[in-house]
Swiss-Prot record:
Keywords for the protein's UniProt record, in alphabetical order: Hydrolase, Manganese
Catalytic activity: adenine + H2O + H(+) = hypoxanthine + NH4(+)
CDD domains: AdeC
Gene Ontology molecular functions: adenine deaminase activity
Family the entry assigns: Belongs to the metallo-dependent hydrolases superfamily. Adenine deaminase family.
Keyword rRNA-binding: no
NCBIfam families the UniProt entry points to: ade
Catalytic activity, EC: 3.5.4.2
Superkingdom of the organism of origin: Bacteria
InterPro entries assigned to the protein according to its UniProt record, in alphabetical order: Adenine_deam (IPR006679), Adenine_deam_C (IPR026912), Amidohydro-rel (IPR006680), Metal-dep_hydrolase_composite (IPR011059), Metal_Hydrolase (IPR032466)
Enzyme class, spelled out: hydrolase
Protein known as: Adenine deaminase
Length: 577
């Protein structure tokens, strides 16, 4: 659009393409509700005021007009549906822009995976921007499927204007110790005036200062107000996260006040489709924040203009002249139930349903089988007893953090076995990319599983397969079924597969609809409950067991990882440990 074309409409000399009458505008600049008409020309807002002529006129009868919602940080792969299906899921909930870090598929398929996300969403009515994965692999403590070097990034950034910056820099020891490759990636992007996203849970003081000196300007890993206050005070945009497992919204809402609100944004990070369909997306965060006493306009700002300004999306996040005509209509601001969604001035969703067709193109990459590993056998899972206590990974259903427990193991015939009565189950991390078996065995506490075994190919960040179980035989059945499917989620018991969800796209995403995936996830959860599982979303919890950049104790295919000290530790710790 040429500037000269919109000016006559803005001046009221020509009719608008779309005129919204009797609107109550949520003005994220003034912090006020403004009653006016809105004139729209092509894909832009031309003006706000007493406009009276439009080729199409919609009388809102006092309904609220809110900028299209923005998710400040997420991994589309965590929705377990294709990028197009993800768009079809979040658009009716008012999300018109997402800032995606595709480091999940990048760890499996490299830049080919990133390009797949970009190409598959061309022409889709969702503003999908990319933060180029910074940490592929995330650490040198596991095997993954690809590497992305600074040289790989140079041409990619020039080729794809949707790249906004560098994705979450997870291996903070590399940064504060001056790792040349990590710093070179930051230098490349910052000299192109791109943003650098952070990932630095629990780090404070001088190490935090050093990390921020590397031009890293955001963090989504805060789990308490004090941590968030320090990072905000040191210049970071705080991305408050509310996903399927990592739910920090309630804990961090007290952070928000009239002095610091511009530096707080909302994001989902990792959210399953059943949670999006049942709860909502960014709209859920707004509703919850308002319910907990946050001013409605402040909540809307965290989901719109704050994020747009941080990421230099200069024509997004507000209802104002010259801004993109991406907006949602809500009848009641406090309840924040979205009745209509407009993208580029076109009505695309009404009352939670799409009113347009969004076609999905098939891509050859969707057929690539990324599993090279052979089947496993029960003997591969054996752990000989040394007469010593062992380290156990303690997981929590509502957090991605883990703790290291030190416990006496249960033994049988000279081997350590799962102890259902004490909720100490065997866990294995198995390299999917290795043609020869490469795996590590550990033990996990906190799932409550009483029978059977569970396996998944979703395992941040390398996405090797993990399997936990009450017995080795069912672990073998579950793991081998995942291998045969080329990725997916599996529950087995008594030697049989009870439920499964194939994930053929990079072993991360399904080719089914969100509704079908949600239904299958619901069935998986039902089966898990029947087997005694106490974790709300075991597959999401299990997906973080291998994440060797978030404290405290993790497992990768190479061994148990002490994340604090960034090194491997033995399963055994001696009788006095």
């Amino acid at each position: 659009m040429n500037i000269i074309d919109i000016i006559p409409v803005a001046r009221g000399k020509q009719p608008a393409d779309l005129l919204l009458k009797n609107a109550r505008i949520v003005n994220v600049f003034s912090g006020e509700i403004e009653r006016a008409n809105i004139a729209i020309f092509r894909k832009r807002i031309a003006g706000i005021g007493d406009y009276s002529e439009g080729k199409q006129v919609i009388d809102l009868h006092g309904a609220y007009v809110v900028p299209g919602l923005i998710d400040a940080h997420l991994h589309i792969e965590s929705s377990m549906v294709s990028p197009v299906e993800f768009a079809k899921t979040v658009l009716p909930r008012g999300t018109t822009t997402v800032i995606a870090d595709p480091h999940e598929i990048a760890n499996v398929l490299g830049l080919d995976g990133v390009e797949y996300l970009i190409k598959s969403t061309e022409g889709v009515p969702l503003n999908l921007y990319i933060m180029l994965p910074s940490s592929v692999p995330a650490t040198n403590l596991e095997n993954n499927g690809a590497r992305i070097s600074v040289m790989d990034m140079i041409g990619f950034v020039e080729k794809h204007p949707r790249v906004l910056g560098l994705g979450e820099v997870m291996n903070y020891p590399d940064i504060i110790n001056g790792d040349h490759d990590s710093i070179a990636k930051i230098e490349l992007l910052r000299h192109k005036y791109k943003k650098i996203d952070g990932h630095i849970p629990g780090i404070s003081g001088k190490d935090l200062n050093a990390y921020i000196c590397a031009f890293i300007r955001s963090d989504h890993e805060c789990t308490n107000v004090e941590e968030a206050k320090e990072k905000l005070a040191r210049g970071m945009q705080i991305l408050v996260r509310e996903g399927s497992v990592a739910r920090n919204l309630d804990e961090l809402l007290p952070l928000i006040n009239e002095k610091n609100y511009p530096f707080i944004s909302f994001c989902t990070d990792d959210k399953h489709p059943n949670d999006i369909l049942n709860e909502g997306h960014i709209d859920y965060m707004i509703r919850y924040a308002i319910k907990k006493g946050i001013d409605p306009i402040t909540a809307v700002r965290a989901a719109t203009i704050n994020t747009a300004r941080h990421y230099n999306l200069r024509s997004m996040g507000a209802i104002a002249p010259g801004y993109k005509a991406d907006f949602v209509i809500v009848d009641n601001l406090e309840e924040f139930r979205i009745s209509m969604v407009f993208k580029d001035s076109k009505l695309i969703a009404e009352n939670g349903k799409l009113v347009i067709d969004i076609n999905r193109e098939q891509f050859p990459l969707e057929e690539v089988n990324t599993f090279k590993c052979p089947h496993i056998e029960e003997k591969d899972l054996e752990v000989l007893n040394k007469g010593e206590n062992i380290r156990v990974i303690r997981v929590y259903g509502d957090d991605v953090l883990t703790k290291e427990l030190r416990m006496e193991p249960k033994t049988k015939d000279g081997r350590i076995v799962s102890d259902v009565n004490r909720d100490i189950l065997k866990v294995a991390s198995i390299c999917r990319y290795c043609e020869e078996k490469s795996m590590a065995i550990g033990f996990i506490n906190g799932t409550g599983l009483k029978q059977g075994a569970v396996a998944t190919s979703v395992g941040h960040d390398a996405h090797n397969m993990s399997v936990i179980g009450t017995n080795d035989a069912d672990m073998v059945v579950a793991a081998n079924r995942v291998i045969d499917m080329g990725g997916g989620l599996v529950i087995a018991n008594s030697g049989k597969v009870l439920a499964e969800l194939p994930l053929p796209i990079a072993g991360l995403m399904s080719n089914l609809s969100s509704k079908e995936v949600a239904e299958r996830l619901g069935h998986l959860k039902t089966v898990l409950k029947e087997l005694g599982c106490e974790v709300p979303d075991l597959f999401m919890t299990l997906s973080f067991v291998q994440l060797s950049v978030i404290p405290e104790l993790r497992i990768t295919n190479q061994g148990l990882v002490d994340v604090i000290n960034n090194n491997f530790v033995s399963l055994f710790i001696g009788k006095e440990g």
